[in-house]
Amino acid sequence: MVLSADDKANIKATWEKIGGHGAEYGAEALERMFASFPTTKTYFPHFDVSHGSAQVKSHGKKVADALANAAHHLDDLPGALSALSDLHAHKLRVDPVNFKLLGHCLLVTLATHLQAGLTPAAHASLDKFLASVSTVLTSKYR
């Protein structure tokens, strides 16, 4: 999926609004995913997936940091996410549908917190961005 110049501007602007809340929002998105799609917990058998868990917070920060890195490398998402793609495809063997589920939960989380700051155009751009990230993360499954 090709990100337009407007999409890239919307993504960067939204990431600036997220600011220092990335880890918090990442953890909340994971909690939302675990609650809404319980089968996703099977990839975290060693985690305490309860609300406020230190492990979920830590992984939420990793998710947020990876997405922030991707948002800063919009012209080279495959390069920015190559190591994560390898990890998820070859070591963790995560079902690719889970990236879409987490992306949806992240959009809901951002809409909850940013409210009017997440315009329809920004929402559409983030949706395209998360779909692109999902595509890159699953590219090494083939």
Swiss-Prot record:
<dbReference type="InterPro" id="IPR000971">
    <property type="entry name" value="Globin"/>
</dbReference>
<dbReference type="GO" id="GO:0005344">
    <property type="term" value="F:oxygen carrier activity"/>
</dbReference>
<dbReference type="GO" id="GO:0043177">
    <property type="term" value="F:organic acid binding"/>
</dbReference>
<feature type="modified residue" description="Phosphotyrosine">
    <location>
        <position position="25"/>
    </location>
</feature>
<dbReference type="GO" id="GO:0072562">
    <property type="term" value="C:blood microparticle"/>
</dbReference>
<dbReference type="GO" id="GO:0031838">
    <property type="term" value="C:haptoglobin-hemoglobin complex"/>
</dbReference>
<dbReference type="GO" id="GO:0020037">
    <property type="term" value="F:heme binding"/>
</dbReference>
<feature type="domain" description="Globin">
    <location>
        <begin position="2"/>
        <end position="142"/>
    </location>
</feature>
<dbReference type="GO" id="GO:0005833">
    <property type="term" value="C:hemoglobin complex"/>
</dbReference>
<dbReference type="InterPro" id="IPR012292">
    <property type="entry name" value="Globin/Proto"/>
</dbReference>
<feature type="modified residue" description="Phosphoserine">
    <location>
        <position position="4"/>
    </location>
</feature>
<dbReference type="GO" id="GO:0019825">
    <property type="term" value="F:oxygen binding"/>
</dbReference>
<keyword id="KW-0561">Oxygen transport</keyword>
<dbReference type="Pfam" id="PF00042">
    <property type="entry name" value="Globin"/>
</dbReference>
<protein>
    <recommendedName>
        <fullName>Hemoglobin subunit alpha</fullName>
    </recommendedName>
</protein>
<comment type="function">
    <text>Involved in oxygen transport from the lung to the various peripheral tissues.</text>
</comment>
<feature type="modified residue" description="N6-acetyllysine; alternate">
    <location>
        <position position="17"/>
    </location>
</feature>
<keyword id="KW-0007">Acetylation</keyword>
<feature type="modified residue" description="N6-succinyllysine">
    <location>
        <position position="41"/>
    </location>
</feature>
<dbReference type="GO" id="GO:0004601">
    <property type="term" value="F:peroxidase activity"/>
</dbReference>
<dbReference type="GO" id="GO:0005506">
    <property type="term" value="F:iron ion binding"/>
</dbReference>
<keyword id="KW-0813">Transport</keyword>
<comment type="similarity">
    <text>Belongs to the globin family.</text>
</comment>
<dbReference type="InterPro" id="IPR002338">
    <property type="entry name" value="Hemoglobin_a-typ"/>
</dbReference>
<feature type="modified residue" description="N6-succinyllysine; alternate">
    <location>
        <position position="17"/>
    </location>
</feature>
<keyword id="KW-0349">Heme</keyword>
<feature type="modified residue" description="Phosphoserine">
    <location>
        <position position="132"/>
    </location>
</feature>
<feature type="modified residue" description="Phosphoserine">
    <location>
        <position position="50"/>
    </location>
</feature>
<keyword id="KW-0479">Metal-binding</keyword>
<feature type="modified residue" description="N6-succinyllysine">
    <location>
        <position position="8"/>
    </location>
</feature>
<keyword id="KW-0408">Iron</keyword>
<feature type="modified residue" description="Phosphoserine">
    <location>
        <position position="36"/>
    </location>
</feature>
<dbReference type="InterPro" id="IPR009050">
    <property type="entry name" value="Globin-like_sf"/>
</dbReference>
<dbReference type="GO" id="GO:0031720">
    <property type="term" value="F:haptoglobin binding"/>
</dbReference>
<feature type="binding site" description="proximal binding residue">
    <location>
        <position position="88"/>
    </location>
    <ligand>
        <name>heme b</name>
    </ligand>
</feature>
<feature type="modified residue" description="Phosphothreonine">
    <location>
        <position position="109"/>
    </location>
</feature>
<comment type="subunit">
    <text>Heterotetramer of two alpha chains and two beta chains.</text>
</comment>
<feature type="binding site">
    <location>
        <position position="59"/>
    </location>
    <ligand>
        <name>O2</name>
    </ligand>
</feature>
<feature type="modified residue" description="Phosphothreonine">
    <location>
        <position position="138"/>
    </location>
</feature>
<feature type="modified residue" description="Phosphoserine">
    <location>
        <position position="125"/>
    </location>
</feature>
<feature type="modified residue" description="N6-succinyllysine">
    <location>
        <position position="12"/>
    </location>
</feature>
<dbReference type="GO" id="GO:0042744">
    <property type="term" value="P:hydrogen peroxide catabolic process"/>
</dbReference>
